[in-house]
Amino acid sequence: MQFLALALTILLAAATQAVPMQADAPSQLEHVKVAMMEYMAQVKETAQRSIDHLDDTEYKEYKVQLSQSLDNLQQYAQTASESLAPYSEAIGVQLTEATAAVRAEVMKDVEELRSQLEPKRAELKEVLDKHIDEYRKRLEPLIKDIVEQRRTELEAFRVKIEPVVEEMRAKVSANVEETKAKLMPIVETVRAKLTERLEELRTLASPYAEEYKEQMVKAVGEVREKVVPLTTDFKGQLGPAAEQAKEKLMALYETISQAMKA
């Protein structure tokens, strides 16, 4: 009886599949075999976990016997599966051949149904569009009411918060002025201190600057005293070139002198 039920199940499954399913019957049987082996492994694992919780002292011999029984059961299932493998493949091939005509009829009926439904697609689209338009007309007033309600709520919120914003803006301006008033004395104090320190620095550096200026003027004068005789000597020898060199040196001297007097 169980074999007959399995055969009918496979027959019905094959009858509802397309042509490419002709080679799937053996694989379906293979899936059943794999599923049974996985189920046996899970049963063994669950039972083994339960056995492991038993006390080794009192149930040691029982645990060994039960573990051995589970191993034997799994091995028996594996052996039976391997022994039935050729028969499973043969049954799959026979079922595929036996149901070929049925599958062909099913595919023919499906194709006829598709041909009949194809012209109905436009009608179906029209009906769906009609229903969607009805839903839209029904929902549109509700959506407008919700939007208007939210707009009213936002306007009321704006009216409530606007005075608060203005008050905060006024407070910020007042706080800025207050902070500025508090900071200005500090800024003026720092500015006065810096001015005082700069004046002290200028006063301290003034003697050194005057001394440096005097030394530079003296050095330039010495250079001039040495250069003038040389230019006079070279004047007769070099002619116009010496005169130009003298003019350039005198101009340089005047520039340095003016800079020192500044």
From Swiss-Prot:
Placement of sequence repeats on the sequence: 64-85, 87-107, 108-118, 119-140, 141-162, 163-184, 185-206, 207-228, 229-239, 240-262
State if Lipid metabolism is listed as a keyword.
yes
- Any one of the GO BP annotations: phospholipid efflux
Give one Pfam family: Apolipoprotein
| 3 X approximate tandem repeats: annotated span | 32-63
GO MF, one term, reads: cholesterol transfer activity
Region (10 X approximate tandem repeats) location = 64-262
GO CC, any one term = very-low-density lipoprotein particle
Domain of life the protein comes from? Eukaryota
| InterPro entries on file | ApoA_E, Apolipoprotein_A1/A4/E
Compartments, record wording? Secreted
The protein's predominant localisation is: secreted
UniProt KW Signal keyword: yes
As given in the record, the signal peptide range reads 1-18
Q: Which keywords describe this protein according to UniProt?
A: Cholesterol metabolism, HDL, Lipid metabolism, Lipid transport, Repeat, Secreted, Signal, Steroid metabolism, Sterol metabolism, Transport
Q: What does this protein do?
A: Participates in the reverse transport of cholesterol from tissues to the liver for excretion by promoting cholesterol efflux from tissues and by acting as a cofactor for the lecithin cholesterol acyltransferase (LCAT).
What family is this? Belongs to the apolipoprotein A1/A4/E family.
Name under which the protein is recorded: Apolipoprotein A-I-2
Q: Which organism is it from?
A: Oncorhynchus mykiss (Rainbow trout)
